[in-house]
Design a protein with these regions (language model features):
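Soluble extramembrane regions of membrane proteins in the secretory/endomembrane system
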Residues: 25-218
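Selective detector of the "anchor" transmembrane alpha-helix that sits immediately C-terminal
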Residues: 10, 217-239
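Juxtamembrane interface at the cytosolic side of transmembrane helices
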Residues: 229-255
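Post-cleavage N-terminal segment of exported redox proteins
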Residues: 1-42
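Hydrophobic alpha-helical transmembrane segments of multi-pass integral membrane proteins
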Residues: 2-5, 210-226, 250-255
Length: 255
């Protein structure tokens, strides 16, 4: 479950390769997500029903997940991740320095960034219990994201082609957020015993050093070459066939 069909955007070879990797080492859907203090954040059912809610809204016609979908609205994975990181940075800045992140010195910012990177990259999924455990302050950052997305789908966004009252049920909004959180978690969390995320460090996110792997870079180059070669071969075929195609005269009247 939670498999995504690849769209027609971007490089098909890269998407196919990344998709294969995700399928082979796909991120676990946890039984539940809890805080270190034991507070329940999301359940497996929340995540699964959240995907259904996203699909019922239009799915890949309304933004994308892991890069698969339309680009009118944001990629929800990348958007959620970026906002959650910013929220976590500010929460830690206030905890350690009693200032907002923007008010910190360069060395203080570097310290906070290092802490946040470790928080997001560290895999806290327990394979025995199926539970993901997150820090209490990270849950506070998640709550900030929930407020933002509630506003997006209740009040609409013209720039995203999302009309007002797209989602009005608070429970549906909560479950949609559960699904997007899970997608973001998979995109930022390293696989167990590996130094690469479940989505091969996609999306690119400098705030936690989520950068393309060497394999991704190589396949990007290969896919571009294949794409250009394919276009060239099609153009050559068309040029050689021109004048050889039999053109039939069409009747003047519709029979």
């Amino acid at each position: 479950f939670l498999d995504f069909a690849f769209g027609s955007h971007g490089s098909f070879a890269v998407l196919g390769w990344v998709g294969t990797r995700i399928y082979q080492e796909k991120p676990p859907v946890p039984e539940k997500v809890v805080t270190q203090s034991g507070q329940l954040v999301y359940t497996k059912l929340d995540i699964q029903e959240g995907q259904n809610i996203w699909q019922a809204m239009g799915g890949m016609q309304i933004g994308s997940v892991w890069g698969h979908g339309s680009y009118v609205a944001p990629d929800w994975t990348a958007d959620w991740l970026h906002k959650e990181i910013l929220g976590t940075q500010n929460l830690l800045a206030k905890q350690f320095y009693q200032k907002t992140f923007d008010e910190l010195t360069d060395s203080e910012k570097s310290s906070i960034k290092s802490k946040v990177t470790k928080i997001f990259k560290t895999n806290r999924y327990d394979v025995n219990t199926g539970v993901i455990t997150i820090e209490d302050f990270r849950y506070e950052a998640i709550k900030l994201n929930v407020i933002h997305y509630s506003d997006v789908f209740l009040n609409g966004r013209d720039e995203y082609a999302i009309p007002k009252n797209t989602l009005i049920d608070p429970e549906k909004i909560r479950k949609f957020n559960a699904f997007i959180f899970w997608g973001s978690w998979a995109a930022s969390t390293n696989r167990l015993d590996e130094d690469v995320t479940y989505t091969n460090n996609w999306p690119h996110e400098d705030l936690i050093d989520n950068k393309p792997t060497a394999d991704t870079v190589v396949w990007t180059g290969v896919s571009i070459i294949i794409l250009l070669l394919g276009i060239g071969l099609m153009a050559l075929w068309y040029a050689t066939q021109k004048g050889q195609v039999e053109h039939k005269d069409f009747p003047s009247d519709d029979p």
